[in-house]
Regions:
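Glycine-rich beta-strand-to-loop/alpha-helix junction loops that act as flexible
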Residues: 40-45, 130-134, 195
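Active-site histidine-anchored catalytic micro-motif
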Residues: 61, 68, 75-76, 123, ...
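Class I SAM-dependent methyltransferase SAM-binding "motif I" and its flanking Rossmann-like core
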Residues: 134-182
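Short glycine-rich phosphate-binding loop at a beta-alpha junction
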Residues: 34-41, 126-128
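ATP/nucleoside-binding phosphotransfer catalytic cores, i.e., glycine-rich phosphate-binding loops
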Residues: 179-182, 186-234
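Ligand-binding beta-strand-loop-alpha-helix segment within the catalytic cores
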Residues: 2, 61-129
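N-terminal glycine-/serine-/threonine-rich phosphate-binding loop
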Residues: 1-38
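A glycine- and small-aliphatic-rich helix-loop capping segment at beta-alpha/alpha-beta transitions
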Residues: 52-60, 83-87, 143-152, 208
Length: 234
């Protein structure tokens, strides 16, 4: 495990750095393998970076992306991460955005659909961009969720699992589909992007103690052989 920490003066500088890194990794993937595969976090922090990335010159027809996790809501719902990605990256003409859920957001059907989709994209992600909540969750790996143990199991090969946060976050009280820890770690570049002092304090706790049950993000930060680039701004 290794951590490379990048401090930025403000959220704008953070977004610029994320966009540049995503673009660079996509260009490298296209040059070396002819295609690129991304897993992208929802939440407010990374979306300015996605808009900047979408405006960059790239052969988007050879790029596929998916959310790192999704709320089990219809694809047109305001809480849907896929909808947010579509809107942010509308200028990335040709980009294939892969959903983790069915169009109606049924949780059980979505779990099965996500696993089938991941079977078609079995290779390593070129970039996984993660966020983190003040409870230490990343993607939808929430502390206290009954399925957390399954999602953290390094031997799981299905790649995605239904998550029922307990308690449900009041701002988004929905079941989720999340990529598992092992699928998130199957990546050439892993980025964790956070803002604010409160999340910085949680990050320091997760870095200090490898306790994924308390801080699920620790499963990524302390994974053997993984290098995580942590981008932070006040």
């Amino acid at each position: 495990m290794a951590w490379v920490q990048h401090r930025h003066d403000d959220a704008g500088a953070l977004a610029d750095a994320l966009a540049a890194t995503l673009h660079r990794q996509c260009e490298r993937a296209l040059a070396e393998r002819g295609h690129a595969l991304l897993a992208l976090a929802g939440g407010r922090t990374p979306f300015p970076a996605y808009r900047a990335l979408a405006a960059a010159e790239l052969d988007w027809s050879r790029v596929a992306a998916m959310p790192t996790d999704e709320r089990c809501v219809p694809h047109g719902h305001a809480a849907c991460n896929l909808r947010g990605l579509r809107e942010a990256m509308v200028t990335a003409h040709g980009l294939a955005l892969e959903p983790l859920t069915t169009a109606d957001g049924d949780p059980d059907a979505s779990e099965a659909a996500a696993r089938m989709m991941l079977a078609r994209h079995a290779g390593a992600f070129d970039v996984v961009l993660l966020g983190m909540g003040e409870d230490g969750h990343t993607a939808s790996l929430f502390p206290g969720a009954p399925q957390l143990g399954a999602a953290l199991d390094p031997t799981r090969a299905d790649g995605a699992v239904r998550i029922d946060p307990d308690p449900l976050p009041p701002e988004a009280p929905f079941p989720r589909i999340s990529l598992t820890a092992s699928r998130l770690l199957h990546a050439r570049c892993i980025i964790l992007a956070i803002t604010g002092q409160a999340k910085r304090a949680v990050l320091e706790q997760a870095l200090a103690v490898a306790d994924p049950r308390r801080h699920p993000v620790a499963a990524i930060l302390h994974a053997p052989g993984a290098t995580v680039h942590v981008h932070w701004s006040p």
